[in-house]
Amino acid sequence: MNQTRVFLIFAWLMVATLLWFEWSRDKAAPAQPAVAAQTAAAPAGSTVPSATAAVPANGTVPAAPVAVPGVTQTPRTGAPPRVTVNTDVLRLVLDGGSVLQADLLHYPQSKTPGSGPVRLFSEDPQHFYTAESGWVSNGSKAPDHHAFVPENGAGEVALAKGSDSISVPFVWQGPEGVTIRRTYTFKRASYEIEVRDQVVNAGPGTWQGTVYRQLLRTPPQVKSGMTNPESFSFNGATWWDGSYQRRKFNEDYLEDGRVNAQVKGGWIAIPQHHFFSAWIPSADDTTTISLDTPDNGARALIRAMGPGVNVGPGQQATTTARLWVGPKLVDKIHAINAPGIDRVVDYSQFAILALLGQGLFWVLNFLHGFIGNWGWSIIGLVILVKLALYPLSAAQYKSFAK
């Protein structure tokens, strides 16, 4: 037996051992506890961070003051004031600083005629999944993600025919003369939502605050099975802190700590088999990424805290982030233009294998451009891979023949 055969056998044994370890760990993982039935979203106290993030001494504040029309905040009594937004690809329900429901109109839940669209964000306690954003402050009043109210009142709006975008404004009026106007902007044929917060200080004192953006989800109960692609997909939280990181939704979610990673130009995301959601702060913003398990561990949370602003009297500051709610379309993901965001496609946890997977997909996509059929494109890719590996296979057969 020559050295090549020994190496191949050793490599095969190593791969088999690693696969067995991973299978054993997943098989032994207990089911996540179900969330008790409820009619409202998660309690405010369970998902609002404490104001521990440092606020910079000098925020991004323009010199000239900007006048803002006075806004009276409506008390939160009875049903919360919500706005339903319809675009050509999305239907969303906004409740202040939260996106409580998101339907992907071009993706039916099943092939059954009349099947409803895939619902990525949901208030259903068993499938609870939402994106939230609010503010915290050490010494001043600040709005959490429940405090914003629609500036034009509750109701339903739609992207008009011939229009490329639609904006939906929310507002919070603080008791100290501080107004925060939040504007959601939706674009045609886009799953990317711009979320812009404008802080205007008409009060006598300096206002300091830090914005937080988070994704909260009840971990899905995935049934194991050879025909269920979800059982082979990564279900957990991912983020970029200078390198690609991820944690599975299981009992180990917080085993390695709550992260507390500070990064400039990072992002947070929750991917699943075909779709994902992500908060992408501005490239120049510094955020602190952390994990949590609120509601007694029944839900998993990933949060990006920051940036902080310091707004003097008569001044204003603005912070903008993007919220992605949609499918894993490679060309659209590349257009997001954020470092490492293409890793949400989950070619592999390991960078070298992810690079290989990206290369194979590029070849597959190239073949599809010529052939026009995914089935034949896959067959063509397999043939090309076989041809590329032919010299190695030939050497292996010659070795076995000896």
Q: How would you name each of these model-derived features?
A:
Residues Q3-F7, I371, G375, I379:
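Hydrophobic, aromatic-rich alpha-helical transmembrane segments
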Residues Q349-I371:
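Hydrophobic alpha-helical segments of integral membrane proteins
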Residues I9, R25-D124:
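Juxtamembrane extramembrane loops of integral membrane proteins
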Residues V199, G314, V385-K402:
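Membrane-interface amphipathic helices and adjacent TM-edge segments
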Residues R82-V344:
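Soluble non-transmembrane domains of integral membrane proteins
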Residues N2-K27:
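Hydrophobic alpha-helical transmembrane signal-anchor segments
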Residues P30-A31, I333-L355:
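Interfacial/capping segments of alpha-helical transmembrane domains
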Residues A11-A16, W376-L387:
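Hydrophobic alpha-helical transmembrane segments of multi-pass integral membrane proteins
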